[in-house]
């Protein structure tokens, strides 16, 4: 039976090699069973440009390339940590970059997919930050800085993000349900798949909509399998 896999929020980094091992294991054992793989953002804990080179980046690039060379399509939606992943990296591994919101047809079902950070509209500080860093001129400027400078900036942003989270309520960092319903009506879908919040679950709200939240990767992987039989985490 044909199936499609969805993953998100792996937050791969040199500091957590066990996550890379989990990813490699998934890519070599489970991923080849699918016809398509969707990565819904934050594959990397941070990304400072396609010109950066490291053992981690090479490993991920090779794993995705091996998958796409087998004829399995791989798609990527940017997360809040790796929104600077560019066409150079994507092309090097045969991966297709998708926009912030994308409608896909999954075995007869019309589904909206996204990373999920745009759904957290109650987090006003983050939404203001996102609006700034999504400006093309600012991204161009950042990507033309020396790698060492970019790395320092990324580390400062990451540390600030950790600090900010300790002062924010859980409710603020979760999706705004009214906005979720609004965006689903806008795209005329009743099924949504997203990540970002790390709260793996399948929310059934008949007859209105189904919202599937991908989990983050930690001690184990979080993989959503979609087939003609429906949705399940494996």
From Swiss-Prot:
Mn(2+) 2 binds at residues 42, 80, 115, 196. Mn(2+) 1 binds at residues 9, 11, 42, 198. It is a peripheral membrane protein. It catalyses: UDP-2-N,3-O-bis[(3R)-3-hydroxytetradecanoyl]-alpha-D-glucosamine + H2O = 2-N,3-O-bis[(3R)-3-hydroxytetradecanoyl]-alpha-D-glucosaminyl 1-phosphate + UMP + 2 H(+). Belongs to the LpxH family. It is found in: Cell inner membrane. One of its GO terms (biological process) is lipid A biosynthetic process. Pathway: Glycolipid biosynthesis; lipid IV(A) biosynthesis; lipid IV(A) from (3R)-3-hydroxytetradecanoyl-[acyl-carrier-protein] and UDP-N-acetyl-alpha-D-glucosamine: step 4/6. CDD domains: MPP_YbbF-LpxH (cd07398). GO terms for cellular component: cytoplasm; extrinsic component of plasma membrane. NCBIfam families: lipid_A_lpxH (TIGR01854), PRK05340.1 (NF003743). Its EC number is 3.6.1.54. Its cofactor is Mn(2+). It comes from Histophilus somni (strain 2336) (Haemophilus somnus). Substrate binds at residues 80-81, 123, 161, 165, 168, 196. This is UDP-2,3-diacylglucosamine hydrolase. InterPro entries: Calcineurin-like_PHP_ApaH (IPR004843), LpxH-like (IPR043461), Metallo-depent_PP-like (IPR029052), UDP-diacylglucosamine_Hdrlase (IPR010138). It holds the Pfam family Metallophos. Binds 2 Mn(2+) ions per subunit in a binuclear metal center. One of its GO terms (molecular function) is UDP-2,3-diacylglucosamine hydrolase activity. Its main location: membrane. Hydrolyzes the pyrophosphate bond of UDP-2,3-diacylglucosamine to yield 2,3-diacylglucosamine 1-phosphate (lipid X) and UMP by catalyzing the attack of water at the alpha-P atom. Involved in the biosynthesis of lipid A, a phosphorylated glycolipid that anchors the lipopolysaccharide to the outer membrane of the cell. Keywords: Cell inner membrane, Cell membrane, Hydrolase, Lipid A biosynthesis, Lipid biosynthesis, Lipid metabolism, Manganese, Membrane, Metal-binding.
């Amino acid at each position: 039976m044909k199936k499609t896999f969805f993953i998100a929020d792996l937050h791969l980094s040199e500091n957590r090699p066990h996550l890379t091992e989990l990813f490699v294991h998934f890519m070599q054992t489970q991923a080849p069973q699918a016809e398509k793989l969707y990565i819904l953002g934050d594959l990397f804990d941070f990304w400072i440009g396609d010109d950066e080179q490291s053992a981690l980046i090479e490993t991920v690039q090779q794993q995705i390339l091996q998958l796409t060379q087998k004829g399995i399509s791989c798609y990527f939606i940017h997360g809040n940590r790796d929104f600077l992943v560019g066409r150079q990296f994507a092309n090097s591994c045969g991966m297709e970059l998708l926009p912030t919101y994308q409608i896909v047809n999954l075995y007869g079902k019309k589904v909206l997919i996204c990373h999920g950070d745009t759904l957290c509209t109650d987090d006003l500080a983050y939404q203001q930050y996102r609006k700034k860093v999504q400006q093309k001129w600012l991204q161009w400027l950042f990507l033309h800085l020396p790698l060492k400078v970019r790395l320092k900036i990324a580390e400062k942003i990451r540390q600030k993000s950790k600090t900010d989270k300790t002062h924010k309520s859980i409710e603020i960092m979760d999706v705004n349900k009214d906005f979720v319903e609004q965006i689903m009506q806008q795209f005329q879908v009743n099924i949504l798949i997203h990540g970002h919040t790390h709260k793996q679950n399948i929310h059934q709200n008949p007859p209105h909509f189904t919202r599937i939240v991908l989990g983050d990767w930690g001690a184990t992987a979080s993989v959503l399998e979609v087939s003609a039989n429906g949705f399940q985490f494996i």
